């Protein structure tokens, strides 16, 4: 039976698509789950993820509240992906996120799950034509920011008949930054939706009525990690606190962390001061081009940058490694952002410390409370990071894998295993962490070499 472009898929197939995901046997699901967790390098799910899985096995409405960094993405994505219909060639699951970074992060998680289902992320900051080219071959899972997804739906860019599940990830953040009308439109334009999942890392959030939840199951894990976080204050004799910041970084030594500022101008001033002291760092703020923000996060994840200087854009919804600390160079104006910033460290079961830089004549807001004082020890400046980042001009669309990139560096490049760091594979390129000391001998051996059928350039980022 042929499909009419105007009328959508035939009713028989739509009915099958609505039923088939829920006919999957438990034994098959468990087997697939074990394979996925193995690919992700995860031994077992944490209590929050297990609870989410149990709720989604019997309920169509879930509100999942859990701190940043506790694995919410896998908590909802794993059971939803295991329920996808392998026979359906249209979009089945839509995930709405407040930021480009979170869209890219979730897309990467799903690719690493190795399910065989196609996934695409769409977001502002890149051409709509690129989106249309990518989703012409339909993904099973579409991830995107509210504005971009709403735009594609209004244009009727794809069939919505098979979209039965919508996730509003960090929904309160999307509302906070002004996406309510787009979110309303998305839900209105997806009439087939049966399962709705909302996630947040904020306590006391209000569920918007337009989502249309009837009897949601609420999982609240927001109190689970308070004991893992230490918050301390560091007094500063001067109002600009720059000298105190450098003393604190020297005191902390070679650890990784985020320094939060409230304003882009302050970030520039602090960045200049850190550069004067040869303290390597990346910058992450809303005023930057998307490609620059992505590269800053890549270099932070692979250790090229031990520090990230950021606005509250980095307080949630970005993929960063385990952090030893965060520093409030400026305190946020609201308690919620204070909590989200602190949530970047002491994630899962790890320890972490949030430091508040306080000018001695400055009164701390009530939401901070009484804090113990951290006494700074005199120490030399931290040594520069031993890592650098290389750009490889070939990626997933060229059928290149992480193993191919590693093989190039080990075989042709004669690189020692301990000198190769994190490899991040993108659609059309790859980024590789490499020990700086090995670069001079490595680069001439690996650039202009073939990976699969493509000759790639390898350059220093």
Stretch-by-stretch model annotation:
Residues 318-330, 353-355:
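A short beta-strand element within the Helicase C-terminal
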Residues 344-370:
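Conserved segment of the helicase C-terminal RecA-like domain
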Residues 132, 280-282, 288-310:
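Conserved helicase ATPase core of P-loop NTP-dependent helicases/translocases
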Residues 228-273:
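Conserved interdomain hinge at the start of the Helicase C-terminal
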């Amino acid at each position: 039976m042929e499909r009419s472009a105007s009328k959508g898929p035939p009713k028989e197939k739509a009915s099958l698509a609505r039923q088939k995901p829920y006919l999957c046997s438990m034994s098959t699901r468990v087997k697939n789950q074990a394979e996925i967790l193995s690919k992700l390098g995860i031994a077992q799910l944490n209590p929050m993820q297990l609870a989410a899985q149990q709720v989604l096995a019997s309920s169509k409405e879930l509100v999942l509240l859990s701190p940043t960094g506790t694995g919410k993405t896998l908590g909802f994505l794993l059971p939803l992906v295991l329920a996808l219909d392998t026979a359906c060639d249209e979009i089945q699951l839509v995930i709405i996120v407040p930021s480009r970074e979170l869209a890219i992060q979730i897309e990467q998680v799903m690719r690493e799950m190795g399910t065989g289902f196609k996934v695409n992320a769409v977001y502002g900051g890149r051409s709509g034509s690129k989106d249309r080219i990518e989703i012409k071959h339909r993904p099973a899972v579409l991830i995107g920011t509210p504005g971009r997804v709403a735009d594609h739906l209004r244009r009727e860019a794809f069939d919505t008949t098979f979209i039965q599940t919508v996730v509003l990830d960090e929904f309160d953040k999307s509302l906070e930054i002004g996406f309510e009308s787009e979110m309303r439109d998305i839900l209105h334009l997806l009439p087939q939706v049966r399962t709705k999942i909302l996630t947040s890392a904020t306590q006391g959030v209000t569920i918007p009525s337009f989502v249309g939840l009837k009897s949601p199951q609420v999982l609240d894990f927001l109190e689970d990690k308070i004991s893992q976080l230490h918050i301390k204050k560091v007094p500063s004799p001067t109002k600009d606190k720059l000298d105190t910041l450098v003393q604190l970084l020297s005191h902390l030594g070679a650890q990784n962390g985020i320094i939060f500022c409230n304003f882009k101008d302050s970030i520039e001033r602090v960045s200049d001061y850190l550069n004067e002291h040869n303290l390597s760092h990346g910058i992450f703020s809303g005023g930057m081009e998307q490609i620059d923000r992505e590269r800053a996060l890549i270099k932070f994840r692979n250790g090229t940058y031990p520090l990230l200087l950021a606005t509250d854009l980095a307080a949630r919804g970005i993929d960063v490694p385990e952090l030893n600390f965060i520093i409030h160079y400026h305190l946020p104006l609201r308690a919620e952002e204070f909590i989200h910033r602190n949530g970047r460290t002491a994630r899962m079961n790890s320890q972490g410390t949030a430091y508040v830089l306080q000018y001695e004549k400055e009164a701390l807001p009530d939401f901070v409370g009484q804090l113990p004082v951290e006494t700074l020890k005199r120490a030399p400046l931290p040594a520069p990071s031993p890592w650098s980042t290389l750009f490889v001009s070939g990626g997933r669309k060229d059928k290149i894998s992480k193993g191919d990139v590693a093989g190039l560096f080990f075989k042709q490049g004669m690189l020692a295993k301990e000198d190769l760091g994190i490899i991040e594979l993108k659609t059309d390129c790859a980024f590789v962490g490499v020990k700086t000391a090995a670069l001079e001998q490595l680069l001439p051996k690996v650039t202009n070499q073939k990976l699969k059928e493509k000759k790639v350039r390898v350059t220093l980022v």
